[in-house]
Design a protein with these regions (language model features):
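Extreme N-terminal "head/tail" segments of very large remodeling/mechanoenzyme assemblies
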Residues: 2, 8-11
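Acidic-enriched and Gly/Ser
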Residues: 2-3, 18-186
Length: 186
């Protein structure tokens, strides 16, 4: 269950939130302000108080507004297409923006879900792989972009299936790996 909290103090974009459970430094939370969720990052925790930095204007925020903590740190999405896009500090795709600014509480997905990429397998069925191991590659701006085993994967995996060379979107499953306990993961 996600940790929740209530805004207890606001000084510009620094907000104090009283929490009902565990939170960690650098964890992401969203504070609801008039139906809009504003992203923030925990910068300090003292007892039941989390001190968070909101990434946009806190105009309209009030003591008593609700916050929900995500249980994970600020992350970026890695994948083909990153080298040909323009991002802000939260990896919002600036080319998708209408006008000069994103609307408050609005975030964009950083990669193109519809683009087809020419995939070339580098591993083969039966290979043993681990976090960071190369499964294949796609070319982006004449540079090979490696498709890797996610860095969050622990231990050794066996490649159960792997797509053949061809065109695929970033949302398609490229490989199925089997972990040391026999569990399959995509």
């Amino acid at each position: 269950m996600a940790t929740k909290g209530i805004v207890k103090g606001i000084v510009s974009n620094l907000v104090t939130v009283e929490v009902d459970g565990p939170v960690s430094q650098n964890e992401i939370c969203y504070i609801s302000v008039g139906g809009v969720k504003l992203m923030a990052e925990v910068i300090k925790v003292i007892g039941k108080n989390a001190f968070v930095q909101v990434f946009e204007s806190t105009r309209g925020m009030r003591v008593g507004d609700e916050a929900e903590f995500e249980g994970h740190m600020l992350e970026v999405t890695l994948g083909p297409g990153m080298l040909s896009r323009n991002y802000d500090g939260l990896q919002n795709d600036l080319d998708k923006m209408e006008g000069v600014f994103l609307r408050r509480g609005e975030y964009t997905f950083p990669l193109d879900n519809d683009k087809l990429w020419d995939f070339k397998p580098l591993a083969k069925v039966g290979d043993k792989v681990a976090a960071g191991g190369w499964l294949g590659e796609v070319d982006e701006n004449f540079q090979p972009h490696k498709i890797m085993v996610p860095f969050t994967f622990k231990g050794e995996y066996t490649v159960k299936s792997l797509k053949e060379a061809g065109q695929y979107t970033i949302g398609e499953v490229i490989a199925v790996l089997t972990d040391e306990t026999g569990k399959d993961v995509e």
